[in-house]
Amino acid sequence: MRLNTLSPAEGAKHSAKRLGRGIGSGLGKTGGRGHKGQKSRTGGGVRRGFEGGQMPLYRRLPKFGFTSMKSAVTAEVRLNELTKVEGNVVTLETLKAANILTKDIQFAKVILAGEVKSAVTIRGLRVTKGAKAAIEAAGGSIEE
C-alpha cells in the first residue's frame, strides 16, 4: 500500500448533485428550484426572521432585561481543580498561574464539585457553603 493507491471505502463518498445538466439527470433546466418565484431567482430568498411582511416575532415581543458584563469576567472553580495550584494558598493570581482561569477573569467562586484532598487556604475568593464545609473538613481555611 502506498500513498498514491489510497482511496476512500466503497460507498463512503457521494457524488455531488450536478444541477442544470440535461433532462436525463433529473436536475436539468430549473435545477430543482421549481418554476418562477423569488426563491427560484439568483440571489433570491428572504432574510432571517422575515415572515412575508407580517410583523415578525422579534418585533412583536417586548424588550426585556439585559446581559450583565460582569458574567464575562466571573468564573467558577471546582474543588478538585484546587489541587493543580502549587502551594497551599489559593488566590486569583495562583489560579491564573496554574491555567485554571484565563487572564481576563476578575472574580471567582469556589463551588462544591469534586473533592479537596489536602488542606488549602482560600484567600480573596468567594466560596459556597458546601465548598466551605468541605475545605474546612479537609483541614483548610478561608480568609477574606
Swiss-Prot record:
InterPro entries documented for this protein: Ribosomal_uL15 (IPR030878), Ribosomal_uL15/eL18 (IPR021131), Ribosomal_uL15/eL18_sf (IPR036227), Ribosomal_uL15_bac-type (IPR005749), Ribosomal_uL15_CS (IPR001196)
One annotated GO molecular function: structural constituent of ribosome
Keyword match Cytoplasm: no
Protein function: Binds to the 23S rRNA.
Protein name: Large ribosomal subunit protein uL15
UniProtKB keywords: Ribonucleoprotein, Ribosomal protein, RNA-binding, rRNA-binding
Bias kind Gly residues: ranges: 21-31
Pfam families per UniProt: Ribosomal_L27A
Organism: Haemophilus influenzae (strain PittGG)
